[in-house]
Amino acid sequence: MAKKKSNTTTILVPDPLRKSVELATGGKGTVLYTSKGYPTYMTIVPSFNCEDVADDLGTGKHPAFIVDGVDKSEIFIATYQSIIHDGQALSLPYQRPRTSINFNDAKAACIEAGPGFHLMTNWEWAAISFWCMKNGFFPRGNTDYGKSHSHPDKVGLRSRDYGITLTGSGPDTWRHDGTMSGISDLVGHVWEWIDGLQLIDGKIKMPSDNNFCQPENKWPDAGSKIDAVNGIQISDAITKRGWTSQWFRDIAAKEGYDVPVALKRALLCPCDAIAGKSEIPGYVWADNSKKQKSAAFRGGSFVDGATAGVFALDLKYAPSSSYCYIGFRAAKAL
């Protein structure tokens, strides 16, 4: 089937706030507006090809930049973890992020913001993480009750809650690109619900591209399973069930099993540039129990210390789960 025509985004409506943000960030950031007219700060992530970041990811545009078969020249990721105002998810600096929210309510608040807005997807998170890997910069964050566990002199502004800081209040090293123009708080602070990835009976389910409007029951089976062997093993069969965990960098495939390239592109199995590298941050937890349906959250929280990171992933909680250390982030594709 022929690929649909690529489209290019042009933002035509100037205003003082948008202009000031774009000038301050050198064009890396902008301000979009929700359907109710509220400003929301977004970081522009230009598209790239899989072969640009790793040799074993295949070729062609990374799936984060393909939405239902349509190529996108960029995606917009909320610069800050979301708050909810008037029913809509907003990205604003120096706010206490919304937490104690379940997956469905987080997703609904993002959609309520207007056309193209959605809960950040696993494909989008993977793309940003690959960018960090390729550029040799792994952001730190609030991983120890308001400060970095590895650099305790680096702190954010505390909210009224014990470990939560105000969005974007940390240092440059808490941004995805090491500058104040980058996406803040991806590591630590609060875990972030992620759309486009589920673990059901140990089977990995995800859309084939960044089609954030596709119903979950239409997602294809990725063809792989998580087996609770040697921590976490990617396999075509399950021999052991239950809660299990592993450093992302150390996740391996069953001997003789050829991992689909899509799983590497989706950060579910490490590519060669990540595998076994001790400097790669992020721990993975999963529950492959029978009849267990797990939604995904990523990044870690303010209590997770060294296990937090851009490669951190939790696949052991139901979508109905709601905790003080789980929040979310919006994204948009035009």
Feature annotation, model-predicted:
Residues 1-30:
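Charged, compositionally biased non-catalytic regions
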